[in-house]
Every structure is written in structure tokens, then in C-alpha cells.
Amino acid sequence: MTTKCTVMAVVLAACICLQVLPQAYGRSTQGYGRMDKLLATLMGSSEGGALESASQHSLEKRQIFDPSCKGLYDRGLFSDLEHVCKDCYNLYRNPQVTSACRVNCYSNRVFRQCMEDLLLMEDFDKYARAIQTVGKK
């Protein structure tokens, strides 16, 4: 009897997953198109040169300090900013997103788009202060 209940529960869970997954996939592809357009725009603009040099110059995987940041070194702030870029990479799985997110010490349109896509805009002021602190020139 317990085996039948377990099998029924697994089948029910699989049916629910099949109904939910296409909707989740559809929402994520809309955001993916926006990020592709933004990256393509940046490749042709003045930020594009910085983006290309950032993508050519790879930082170590675990490196938390960005040498383009000339302000106050605060490991906690760098960690918060880098966390946004890593989450954005996990959302889009595009290495250019990570490097573009770090350009100009996180002060760029890709970082802002990542914040919007990750639903972090209610914390915008916190991140803006962090960028100003670590990125003063």
C-alpha cells in the first residue's frame, strides 16, 4: 500500500513539474533577449571597448578585487557587488555578462540590468553607495 502511495506521489509531482517548467522557461527567455541586446549595444559603444578588454583580461575565478576600482577597498562591499554579477551569470549562463557587469567598477548599464532581472531594485541605493565607495577615482 505504501509503495502505491509513493508511486502516485512521484507521478503527481512529475505532472506538476511538467506544467510549471514551460512557463518558467518562457519568462527567462524574455529577459535573455534583453541582455543580448544590451551586450550587443555595448559592443558598439564607448563602453564596448572596456567590455572587450575586460572579456580578454580574465580575472581569477575566486578573485574578489577588481583592479579598475580605485576607491576604498572593502571586501564586504566587493563581495556584495560580485554576488550580483555571479547571480546574473547564473541566470543567463553567458561569460560576457560577468565581465560586462564588472566594467568601470560595476558602474554600468549591465550591472543595473542585472539588478532589475534579479529583482534587486528595492536595494538600489545600497548598491549605488557601495559602487561609489569602491569606485572613487
From Swiss-Prot:
Keywords: Amidation, Cleavage on pair of basic residues, Disulfide bond, Hormone, Neuropeptide, Pyrrolidone carboxylic acid, Secreted, Signal. Disulfide bonds join C69-C105, C85-C101, C88-C114. It is found in: Secreted. The keyword Secreted applies. InterPro entries: Crust_neurhormone_CS, Crust_neurhormone_H, Crust_neurohorm, Crust_neurohorm_sf, Hyperglycemic, Hyperglycemic1. The modification Valine amide is found at V134. The modification Pyrrolidone carboxylic acid is found at Q63. Residues 1-26 form the signal peptide. GO terms for molecular function: neuropeptide hormone activity. It holds the Pfam family Crust_neurohorm. Produced by the medulla terminalis X-organ in the eyestalks and transported to the sinus gland where it is stored and released. GO terms for cellular component: extracellular region. Represses the synthesis of methyl farnesoate, the precursor of insect juvenile hormone III in the mandibular organ. Also has hyperglycemic activity. Belongs to the arthropod CHH/MIH/GIH/VIH hormone family. This is Mandibular organ-inhibiting hormone. It comes from Libinia emarginata.
